[in-house]
Amino acid sequence: MAPKKPEPKKDDAKAAPKAAPAPAPPPEPERPKEVEFDASKIKIEFTPEQIEEFKEAFMLFDRTPKCEMKITYGQCGDVLRALGQNPTQAEVLRVLGKPRQEELNTKMMDFETFLPMLQHISKNKDTGTYEDFVEGLRVFDKEGNGTVMGAELRHVLATLGERLTEDEVEKLMAGQEDSNGCINYEAFVKHIMSS
């Protein structure tokens, strides 16, 4: 005679199998840390000749009635760019202490306040190379023939990242499209980087 199988308990039959606990969501990737700007900790490493040159450029932007050697917060990015830097608007706002929109045209700064900002921006450049820009545009090259659609590039420039105005996009793209509305992106990047 075969051994008797134990009969299952009635409670066990009614118990539903326990669901496994939901897996924990994957941890979010750590955001890159912003380089904090503290003007008091910035060591000025420019030569006296460079500082004099920067001062002359700074004075060109001074719109005060008595030439007080001051610019508005809103002009800071323009002066930085005139001095060969290429900060994003977000970087400019960060070194300015993230002022409110209305403060950009009313708050003023003198050259001594500006100089540490220039030093910080020039040391923390994250300038893309020609290859970086070409690689970024290659994503939009659907045919693999070295071109992107002009309309698509216009859309990207106006809606992604540091957005450009319609006028800025038109100036940038003037004379770049071929008869099919395509743009050779390698030539486009060369054009932009030489401007």
Curated annotation (Swiss-Prot):
Described function: Regulatory light chain of myosin. Does not bind calcium.
Region annotation (Disordered) ranges: 1-37
PTM statement from Swiss-Prot or TrEMBL: The N-terminus is blocked. N-terminus is methylated by METTL11A/NTM1.
Phosphothreonine sites (modified residues): 88, 127, 129
Organism taxonomic ancestry: Eukaryota, Metazoa, Chordata, Craniata, Vertebrata
Protein name per its UniProtKB record: Myosin light chain 3
Superkingdom assignment: Eukaryota
GO CC terms, sorted: A band; cytosol; I band; muscle myosin complex; myosin II complex; sarcomere
GO biological process, one term: regulation of striated muscle contraction
Record: disease: Cardiomyopathy, familial hypertrophic, 8: A hereditary heart disorder characterized by ventricular hypertrophy, which is usually asymmetric and often involves the interventricular septum. The symptoms include dyspnea, syncope, collapse, palpitations, and chest pain. They can be readily provoked by exercise. The disorder has inter- and intrafamilial variability ranging from benign to malignant forms with high risk of cardiac failure and sudden cardiac death. Rarely, patients present a variant of familial hypertrophic cardiomyopathy, characterized by mid-left ventricular chamber thickening.
